[in-house]
């Protein structure tokens, strides 16, 4: 079994979520004629719709949209406001949207530009003769406000990708698709699913502040539109790929290759036998290739394609509950909702089921998808081939969870929850008021112990504070008011009477 020193080295470094997603889009300039801008707004303002979408997904910092329809108005806004993104909507009236975009790119090369086009044959034909190289992405407006949220999140993910992966090991979902209409439909569904899942796993945080920060650790979604672009991303971040979703037909070597996606599957699978792969194609015959490389298959022609994709992503990429299955029948053996439940059942899981999951890196992938990077990184390295002892694996998983939970509880003032407070909980409060002097002092010492890892280096000695639950001042006030005790407490009565 691994030495205590190695366990300490791997677990006791907390994840600094506060340093993630530092680059944000706050102001968006929308270049569109009045009719197209109205079409986006439909029955309400864009700002209002985006704000509502952000609130529904527990997201903060919704961007502000500014709409202009002429080059003069665009320059006036750019001179007075710092914009983080420009969205251009080419209309059917042959307006000079692309000319405005080119002028903006020349003057402000650091601002990303995106094309958002209504689905019409006239505009599509016109775009074929335009130079779109200045644009980050081209999207097709299908009447869903979710697309605007997806555009913003896709750009933010791209801006923060390299830093966040290097900082804490954030995971990446690689989507490879060249059909504008198709990825304009898939991305909103994929983002909504991932953001909803991040809301779920954030509930394991110990207080509201940590919940908000932990959502920054969600997997990022990255869009590639050619084989070369996909391979560049995979080569650079292959140790942080949560899964790959690929079309079958897209450009490779400068020409459309009907087997590009199959070749990508083969290359990725040759390097990683465990990473989840999904092949989505309108050609059902490609299902054979999906099976060959251990990939799931999604039929693009299916009316419930988005539902099928969401279910496969949930099962294969480690989202949702962890379901232990019988390897022969794939029937459910046990289900865990959170880390504490996994800790409680790990010794009761049948050997065959546990072997099935650990030999495929399912446990580490589940932890990665929930932004629990320290134990995920450690367990990913403990392969079945290197250990080949099922009981040792149980103990290592258990010890990893215990050490991680202890580390996360230390130095944090948690909100008391009866179903979560156990022997590994450290400091919790009941109420929203002040901790008081004694409680604050204990919380401070606990925080200092967590900051100074040298306290763990003393043999046969552990530096900790007593396990503590603090009743905040508002709970005390409520108790005094409910029982009408203030009149007695503040009177001149002697101590025995009080």
Predicted regions and their residues:
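Terminal, compositionally biased segments used for targeting/anchoring and flexible tails
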Residues: 285-409
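Nucleotide/phosphate-binding sheet-loop regions of phosphoryl- and nucleotidyl-transfer enzymes
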Residues: 378-498
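As written
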Residues: 127-138, 289-297
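Conserved phosphotransfer microenvironments
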Residues: 10, 39-42, 46-51, 62, ...
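Non-catalytic signal-transmission and effector/linker regions of two-component phosphorelay proteins
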Residues: 1-66, 130-137, 141-220, 227-228, ...
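Hydrophobic/aromatic residues positioned on beta-strands within the core alpha/beta folds
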Residues: 116-118, 280, 300
């Amino acid at each position: 079994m691994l030495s205590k020193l190695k366990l300490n080295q791997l677990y006791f470094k907390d994840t600094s979520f506060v340093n993630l997603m530092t680059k944000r889009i706050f102001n968006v300039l929308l270049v569109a004629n009045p009719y197209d801008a109205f079409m986006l707004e439909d029955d309400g303002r864009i700002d209002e719709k985006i704000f509502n979408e952000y609130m529904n997904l527990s997201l903060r910092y919704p961007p502000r949209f500014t709409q202009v329809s002429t080059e003069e108005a665009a320059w006036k806004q750019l001179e007075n406001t710092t914009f983080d993104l420009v969205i251009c909507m080419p209309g059917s009236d042959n307006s000079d949207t692309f000319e405005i975009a080119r002028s903006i790119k020349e003057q402000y090369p650091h601002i990303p530009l995106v094309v958002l086009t209504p689905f019409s044959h006239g505009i599509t034909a016109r775009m074929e003769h335009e130079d779109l190289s200045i644009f980050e992405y081209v999207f097709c407006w299908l009447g869903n406000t979710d697309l605007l949220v997806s555009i913003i999140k896709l750009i933010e993910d791209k801006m923060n990708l390299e830093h966040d992966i290097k900082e804490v090991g954030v995971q990446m979902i690689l989507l490879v698709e060249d059909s504008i209409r198709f990825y304009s439909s898939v991305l909103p569904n994929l983002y909504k699913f991932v953001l909803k899942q991040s809301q779920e796993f954030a509930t394991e945080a110990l207080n509201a502040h940590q919940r908000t920060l932990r959502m920054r650790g969600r997997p990022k979604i990255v869009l590639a539109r050619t084989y070369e672009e996909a391979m560049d991303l995979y080569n650079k971040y292959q140790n942080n790929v949560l899964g790959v979703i690929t079309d079958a037909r897209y450009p490779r070597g400068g020409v459309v290759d009907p087997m590009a996606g199959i070749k990508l599957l083969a290359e990725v699978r040759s390097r990683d036998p465990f990473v989840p792969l999904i092949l989505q194609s309108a050609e059902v015959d490609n299902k054979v290739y999906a099976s060959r490389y251990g990939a799931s298959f999604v039929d693009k022609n299916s009316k419930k394609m988005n539902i099928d994709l969401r279910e496969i992503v949930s099962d294969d990429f480690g989202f949702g509950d962890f379901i232990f299955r019988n390897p022969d029948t794939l029937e459910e053996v046990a289900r865990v909702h959170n880390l504490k439940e996994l800790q409680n059942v790990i010794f009761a899981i049948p050997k065959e089921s546990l072997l099935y999951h650990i030999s495929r890196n399912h446990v580490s992938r589940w932890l990665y998808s929930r932004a629990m990077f320290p134990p995920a990184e450690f367990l990913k390295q403990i392969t079945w081939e290197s250990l080949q002892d099922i009981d040792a694996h149980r103990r290592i998983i258990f010890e990893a969870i215990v050490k991680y939970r202890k580390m996360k509880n230390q130095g944090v003032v948690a909100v008391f929850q009866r179903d979560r407070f156990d022997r590994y909980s450290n400091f919790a409060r009941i109420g929203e008021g002040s901790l008081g002097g004694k409680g604050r002092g204990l919380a401070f010492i606990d925080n200092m112990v967590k900051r100074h890892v040298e306290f763990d280096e003393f043999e046969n000695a552990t530096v900790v504070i007593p396990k503590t639950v603090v009743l905040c001042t508002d709970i005390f006030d409520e108790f005094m008011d409910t029982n009408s005790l203030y009149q007695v407490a503040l009177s001149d009565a002697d101590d025995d009477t009080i």
